[in-house]
Amino acid sequence: MRVKDAVELASYAVSEAVSRGRVHPEAAPRERGEFQRDRDRIVHSTAFRRLEYKTQVFVNHEGDLFRTRLTHTIEVAQLTRSLARALGLNEDLAEAIALAHDLGHTPFGHAGQDALHACMKDYGGFEHNLQSLRTVELLEDRYAAFDGLNLLFETREGILKHCSRPNAEKLGELGARFLNGTQPSLEAQLANLADEIAYSNHDVDDGLRSGLITLEQLDSIDVFAEHRRAVQSRWPGLAGRKLISETVRSMVNAMALDLIAQTRANIADAGVRTVDDVRAGPRLVAYSSSLQPRLRALKGFLRENLYWHYQVLRMTDKARRIIGDLFGAFMADPRLLPPQYQEKARTDKPRAIADYIAGMTDRYAMKEHRRLFAVGEIH
């Protein structure tokens, strides 16, 4: 993918001039843009650092080479920024959204999220996108003038990829698009699909590294087999790690190029000229009709052969029990919570407990579980 070193923003890209601003007004930064400020605040946040020790597919301590939420997030941000540049979109906004998209994830990945949602079913539920928003709006505790990071509207909007209708009704302008059917910015749409490209391909890589899936199994999936053959045609005799890496690299590049071409065509067909046109129209960032079923087949393969592999399911079952046990213990006796969460629990005990658990890393959650439940653990 060859693009210019710098591009002017397209007329339909979000710019500072059309931004809806921050909840708490601030003086403009002197040597950087407003969306750069958002990106920098996210990178320096506590929640961002914790992603290093949160699960992508494999529990953090299972292997040093497997991706964590942090390495996944960095890969998504890199891909998002490259795609944004190719399309003339706001790179800083797109990157900020990508960097923040998983800040609200629980320990133990989707298993932890599902377990915490089950615990919270009578208290408003738990949605990791909403928790990411809650993190940047309230939970980060760094600035004297406000809670959270005080990010621009467009960054916060992009973080909120999914939202149930009851929760959207509580979010005012930020939740309006889930009620009236309008679209987020192209930068937000782009970060969403860059996430999909990254995790689909990199889970292939990690799955092969782990030995839970094999090249022979993956050859049943057209999109993988096609790129593997192309790589081996170019480099006869290539095998092992280099074959896997080159095949995954080829798949990522092809999907990115497909996304760019289809999105450009969609923008042209829709006659989009402004950010308002983007919001009022159909979803524009998309794959081609030929790639969509092939990507679905790859995701289906990963679900059945990696995510549902018995060794992964054993980990996720243990994770659900840890989350459930912690939630139950803290609900029964909130005095077991750290002091700052005891204070919050006085006004909303379930949500304070959910905030505490969601902020844990995999290792911290396991350690906290041992402290509370393991015989002989007293500290």
Swiss-Prot record:
SMART domains: HDc (SM00471)
Keywords: Hydrolase
HD domain location: 69-200
GO molecular-function terms, A-Z: dGTPase activity
Pfam family name, one: HD_assoc
Ribosomal protein recorded as keyword: no
PROSITE patterns: HD (PS51831)
GO biological process, one term: dGTP catabolic process
InterPro entries: dGTPase, dGTPase-like, dNTPase_2, HD/PDEase_dom, HD_domain, PHydrolase_assoc_dom
Family affiliation: Belongs to the dGTPase family. Type 2 subfamily.
Name under which the protein is recorded: Deoxyguanosinetriphosphate triphosphohydrolase-like protein
Organism: Azoarcus sp. (strain BH72)
